[in-house]
Amino acid sequence: MTIGVLGLQGDFREHLWALQKLQVETIVVKTVEDLRKTKGLIIPGGESTTIGKLARLTGIADELEKLVDQDFPIYGTCAGMILLAKQIVNYPYQYSFGFMDIVVERNAYGRQVESFEVNLDIPSTGGLFKAIFIRAPKIVEWGEGVEVLARYGDSPVLVRQGNLLASSFHPELGQDLRIHKYFLEMAGVKHAGIC
């Protein structure tokens, strides 16, 4: 079973590396045809406005809308989380897919030079996880159907809603593959047990 990584812009190569290390068949998704070959999709960090525009231009956004109705698994990191959100408070006119019942604030954890790493307690992945935050979005509201898997302070930074997963941080930039494994298990994709 193939997992796609949206390759329109952003750090998609790092996600490919993580999936390949887990011995999962992967494809870079740049077209609707690419997307149709997958059993799940990762939307990487990058520039959410650019990724959103390109997803609409290529038809990928429309195709994702159909797939989400069929419980298609999607994981969004950083910019990917912004695109999954139903609303972006500090950029109300920015396009998002709106699949998750979360409201986010872009760049809420600071600018690029204010990036940081922190250990998060994530029981569903086996405890402490070193999370890397780079111009990260903050979840400021979330619906009842959204499960909070990890928090930084009082704010959720890893959430799940059905077959949708989103994180403010970048697990693809570290060596710990447990978040990717969690997503693969959500998607029903077998992987190597490497951490």
From Swiss-Prot:
* GO terms classed as biological process: glutamine catabolic process; pyridoxal phosphate biosynthetic process; pyridoxine metabolic process
Alphabetically list the UniProt keywords.
Glutamine amidotransferase, Hydrolase, Lyase, Pyridoxal phosphate
Q: Name one GO cellular component term.
A: glutaminase complex
Q: Where does L-glutamine bind?
A: G46, E47, S48, R106, I134, R135
List of catalytic residues: C78 (nucleophile), H170 (charge relay system), E172 (charge relay system)
The answer, when asked if Lyase is one of the entry's keywords, is yes
- Which EC numbers does the record give? 4.3.3.6, 3.5.1.2
Q: Which reaction does it catalyse?
A: aldehydo-D-ribose 5-phosphate + D-glyceraldehyde 3-phosphate + L-glutamine = pyridoxal 5'-phosphate + L-glutamate + phosphate + 3 H2O + H(+); L-glutamine + H2O = L-glutamate + NH4(+)
Q: What does the record give as its pathway?
A: Cofactor biosynthesis; pyridoxal 5'-phosphate biosynthesis
Recorded GO MF terms: glutaminase activity; pyridoxal 5'-phosphate synthase (glutamine hydrolysing) activity
**A Pfam family recorded for this sequence:** SNO
Matching InterPro entries, A to Z?
A: Class_I_gatase-like, PdxT/SNO, PdxT/SNO_CS
**Record flagged with keyword Lyase:** yes
- Self-association or partners: how does it assemble? In the presence of PdxS, forms a dodecamer of heterodimers. Only shows activity in the heterodimer.
Q: Which family does it belong to?
A: Belongs to the glutaminase PdxT/SNO family.
Annotated PANTHER family: PYRIDOXAL 5'-PHOSPHATE SYNTHASE SUBUNIT SNO (PTHR31559), PYRIDOXAL 5'-PHOSPHATE SYNTHASE SUBUNIT SNO1-RELATED (PTHR31559:SF0)
Q: What does this protein do?
A: Catalyzes the hydrolysis of glutamine to glutamate and ammonia as part of the biosynthesis of pyridoxal 5'-phosphate. The resulting ammonia molecule is channeled to the active site of PdxS.
Q: What protein is this chain from?
A: Pyridoxal 5'-phosphate synthase subunit PdxT
Species in which this protein is naturally found:
Pseudothermotoga lettingae (strain ATCC BAA-301 / DSM 14385 / NBRC 107922 / TMO)
